[in-house]
Regions:
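Conserved C-terminal beta-signal and adjacent last beta-strands/turns
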Residues: 237-358
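Outer-membrane beta-barrel transmembrane domain signature of Gram-negative proteins
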Residues: 1-61, 98, 196-206, 218, ...
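Surface-exposed extracellular loop regions of Gram-negative outer-membrane beta-barrel proteins
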Residues: 13, 42-78, 86-92, 101-147, 167-188, 212-223, 245-266, ...
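Residues on the lipid-exposed face of transmembrane beta-strands in outer-membrane beta-barrel proteins
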Residues: 47-53, 93-97, 140, 150-154, ...
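Transmembrane beta-strands of outer-membrane beta-barrel pores
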Residues: 7-13, 55-57, 66-72, 109-115, ...
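Repeated loop/turn-to-beta-strand initiation elements of outer-membrane beta-barrel proteins
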Residues: 1, 57-60, 102-105, 158-161, ...
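Outer membrane beta-barrel strand-and-loop segments of large Gram-negative receptors
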Residues: 29-36, 137, 141, 156, ...
Length: 358
């Protein structure tokens, strides 16, 4: 039996400043209602207990985690504070069957929380681009995800395979809400407007074709369903989605490797529209010197010039279709030298806010 307690706290303070150029005075002036000072404070107190066991190739664990969230957001455009206080329970259970050294079966259930970041909470109007203004919602609730999955792993001498079936149910799903603001501009906000489910199968395989050639392939196909109330309209939408990725590595010499990778994401629905498919591919060459201490590399991104995606939004009195295009291919050159083989790499502390905000 394992038990524990954890405390996490954060404070985000910042000034939102938006200025326009006055063509008469040739001076930048602050724009009313676009400037604000924000102070976000959040504390999470958590306690957990976990029980585990093992017998003759079978192992299991079950646990329960409880979290109490206390979040306060204040800003200068309003005198009142936004307060959110809530208890959450997170059960988890996992089981593992080892049939032999080369195959195993896993099954599990877990519940997770995804708290909204500053971008979604800040009640400050800002220009995302020329056609969209965005304002956060300080009353957003965290998303709660419930994941059940079963996975099978099998290894051969030069080939490995993983197949995973899963069902993911997300409560309090945060949707983007787009409304017409002017003839050419939408205003975007966020709301806990419904729920989503994803039911699918994930497959990955790695093949050592030869000593100098390895190939990896992964694919995910799932049924995606959205339901809820978006801006006063009942939404019930479904799409069959797919994602594919592949890479292959050629060892041209002992210290020289060539790698090609590709990824594809299919069309998918959103709460108010759809996103088209996207295909990306790149190639890289890597050479190491002096017992792998010095590394030089070259990487070409977007080699087929396919970095083009269209996002469509449709709602009451508004329609928007934006094509995001990056025509240029990018060549990246790199060089690195490792001074000490024995030096341990420091691990930066990861938080649920840091990676998303940056």
């Amino acid at each position: 039996l394992e038990m524990g307690y954890q405390w996490r706290g954060l404070r985000h303070r910042g000034d939102f400043v938006y200025e326009r150029l006055n063509l008469v005075t040739d001076m930048y002036e602050k724009t009313q209602n676009y400037n604000n000072q924000l102070d976000l404070q959040q504390q999470v107190n958590a306690a957990y207990a976990q029980l585990s066991g093992e017998k003759q190739g079978f192992s299991w664990n079950a646990g329960l985690r409880t979290e109490y969230t206390d979040r306060t957001l204040s800003h200068t455009l309003e005198t009142s504070n936004y307060r959110y206080k809530q208890w959450h329970l997170f059960p988890t259970a996992q089981a593992l069957w080892l049939f032999d050294k080369k195959q195993k079966l896993r099954a599990g259930f877990s519940r997770r929380i995804d708290r909204p970041t500053n971008r979604y909470l800040a009640p400050v109007r800002n220009h995302r681009h020329a056609e969209v203004e965005e304002i956060g919602n300080p009353e957003l609730l965290p998303e709660i995800g419930n994941l059940a999955e079963v996975a099978y792993d099998k290894n051969w001498s030069r080939f490995s395979l993983n197949v995973t079936g899963y069902f993911n149910y997300v409560q309090n799903k945060i949707f983007k809400i787009n409304r017409p603001y002017s003839r050419t501009t939408l205003i975007r906000s966020f709301a806990n407007a419904g729920r989503t489910t994803s039911t699918g199968i994930d497959l990955s395989a790695e093949w050592g074709i030869a000593k100098w050639w390895r190939f990896f392939l992964a694919g995910n196909v799932y049924d995606f369903y959205i339901s809820g109330d978006v801006d006063g309209l009942t939404v019930s939408r479904r799409s069959l989605n797919a994602a594919l990725s592949a890479n292959t590595t050629f060892t041209l010499a002992r210290d020289l490797k060539l790698q090609w990778d590709a990824s594809y994401v299919s069309r998918t629905i959103t709460s108010q529209g759809e996103d088209t498919d996207l295909f990306l591919s790149g190639i890289a060459l890597r050479y190491t010197f002096w017992e792998d201490r010095l590394t030089v590399g070259a990487q070409m991104q977007n080699i087929f010039n396919t970095n083009i995606q269209t996002l469509t939004i449709e709602g009451p009195g508004a329609y928007s279709s934006t094509e995001y295009t990056k025509y240029d291919r990018a060549l990246l050159l790199s060089a690195g030298y490792r001074l000490n083989d024995k030096a341990k790499k420091g691990k930066a502390q990861k938080t649920e806010y840091g990676e998303k905000d940056f």
